[in-house]
A protein has these predicted regions:
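OB-fold/S1-family single-stranded nucleic acid-binding modules
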Residues: 55-61, 116-168
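OB-fold (S1/OB) nucleic-acid-binding surfaces
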Residues: 49-80
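Aromatic-rich juxtamembrane segments at the membrane interface
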Residues: 148-275, 280, 284
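Residue-level "contact hotspot" at macromolecular interaction interfaces
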Residues: 28-30, 35, 87, 101-102
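Internal transmembrane alpha-helical bundles of multi-pass membrane proteins
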Residues: 265-438
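N-terminal leader/targeting segments
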Residues: 1-28, 127-132, 139-142, 154, ...
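Short nucleic-acid-contacting surface segments enriched for D/E, G, S/T with interspersed K/R
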Residues: 85-111
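Structural detector for short beta-strands of small beta-barrel domains
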Residues: 32-49, 56-58
Length: 438
């Protein structure tokens, strides 16, 4: 399993094998001639670095020009003006009465479009902090390097019409995400940060704090990752004393699926889900996994994800996620004995895991983004527990607010105290600037 995963990784990233893109856009007209496109939204909208648009992936059905129309297949990146996307969001100033367009996954949109040339599209793509799913081609282009990764065609939506939902489940998800935004809006900046942690939506996250997370080497906390799933697994594990280990494992799987459905299947979330799924299957087969077994789970997840989700292979989130876990499994055991000589065992284990992940991801971070944050070695050890407590307390608070809405403002004080502690810690470590290579 490990040899197969290593060979596959070398073949993919050395460009010896170029996987076919199942989502490559195809239609019978030149891209420059396209004036209209219709299809279903297949990703969460995320604000671009310019702040003028929201970027999303559209699974195209039809395309047309002024004098003809044809069927289309594959995906495009659609840039929708902020005022249209934010029309339904709480606290925003825009209002499009009777013309509201819910821009969420599963919505069918009919748009008149204008193509954006690749040379001018870099400033209109999603920021890496908004989920960490920046493609390797975009990242390397931003660093001045060339990439042969095929680019998704980019279009600006000049007019957009909502034409229904793909199914009732997509509609339920969109309404649930909108309702969560309205609940968390009452908690101010604390609610904005919690919204980013729960759903991957960064519309209400304090921009200075988001930048501080990056400067402090903590961008992985804002990105949906395995850390979030591990918290759900830990919560479900407490039920094993009531229902048994196997039932608790099933509950963990249900909670993970529900979270991925609500937040969206980012590459790092899929990686974490596959690793846990393999581990749960092993548990049902009464197979005890050691650290070597955990590495086998990671290799199995890598093979499955590259086989079925080609679009993830060259994303920064995919590469950094696997590199981080590989570093924890392979490097941290060599660091742990040294740290145990002067640190308590629990702290040494946490520090060695952080060091392993940092050492494994630093070369990739330098190549993809042009900088590294050495302070992340220390900040992750201190801030990650604070973020976990804030995340768990926020989820519990939202649960009670949904049942008893009058508790919304009563719980606000607790959330604000936890947010202040987390914010202070992040801003402190952000004073140590990252090292730039550009």
């Amino acid at each position: 399993m490990r040899i197969a995963a290593v060979i596959l990784a070398l073949a993919l990233y050395a460009r010896m094998v170029k996987p076919a893109d199942p989502y490559a856009f195809r239609c019978c007209m030149p891209l420059d001639k396209l004036g209209s496109i219709s299809g279903f939204v297949v990703s969460n909208p995320s604000k671009t670095s310019s702040g003028r648009f929201y970027s999303l992936l559209l699974d195209a059905e039809r395309a047309g020009s002024a004098d003809m129309s044809c069927s289309a297949r594959g995906r495009i990146r659609l840039l929708v003006p902020c005022e249209l996307v934010e029309a339904l969001y709480p606290g925003k100033l825009f209002s499009l009465s009777k013309k509201d367009v819910p821009v969420e996954q599963g919505a069918r949109l009919v748009c008149t479009v204008r193509r954006v040339k690749e040379s001018s599209a870099s400033g209109m793509l999603p920021t890496s902090s908004a989920g960490g799913a920046m493609s390797a081609s975009v990242a390397t282009t931003a660093c001045g390097a060339k990439s042969d990764t095929p680019a998704v065609p980019v279009f600006i939506a000049e007019t957009t019409v909502f034409a229904g939902w793909k199914n009732g489940i997509c509609r339920l998800r969109a309404l649930s995400r909108l309702y969560l935004k309205r609940v968390l809006y009452a908690w101010g900046d604390a609610g904005g940060l919690l919204l980013a942690l729960v759903s991957g939506s960064h519309e209400y996250t304090d921009e200075k704090l988001a930048q501080a997370f990056q400067n402090a080497g903590l961008a992985h906390i804002l990105a949906l990752s395995g850390m979030h799933l591990s918290l759900f697994i830990s919560a479900a594990s407490f039920s094993k004393f009531l229902v048994g280990k196997k039932a608790a494992s099933v509950l963990s799987l249900i909670l993970m699926c529900a979270f991925m459905w609500f937040a969206g299947a980012s590459p790092s979330l899929v990686r974490a889900f596959l690793c846990v799924l393999v581990a749960l299957i092993a548990r049902f087969l009464f197979i005890e996994l050691s650290e070597k077994g955990s590495l086998d789970c990671l290799c199995a997840a890598f093979i499955v994800q590259t086989a079925f989700l080609h679009a993830d292979i060259y994303s920064a989130a995919f590469m950094l996620s696997y590199a981080a876990i590989a570093g924890i499994l392979l490097i941290s055991p060599f660091v742990r004995p040294f740290l145990c000589t002067f640190l308590p065992q629990k702290l040494a284990e946490s520090a060695s895991a952080t060091a392993g992940a940092w050492l494994a991801t630093t070369p990739l971070t330098a190549v993809l983004f042009g900088h590294i944050a050495p302070v992340g070695l220390i900040s992750s050890i201190i801030v990650t527990p604070l973020a976990s407590v804030f995340f768990i307390a926020g989820c519990i608070g939202v649960f009670f607010c949904l049942i008893l809405p009058f508790l919304l403002y009563s719980l606000n004080g607790i959330i604000q105290v936890l947010y202040a502690a987390l914010k202070y810690a992040v801003l402190f470590f952000a004073r140590f600037k990252p090292i730039d290579f550009l």
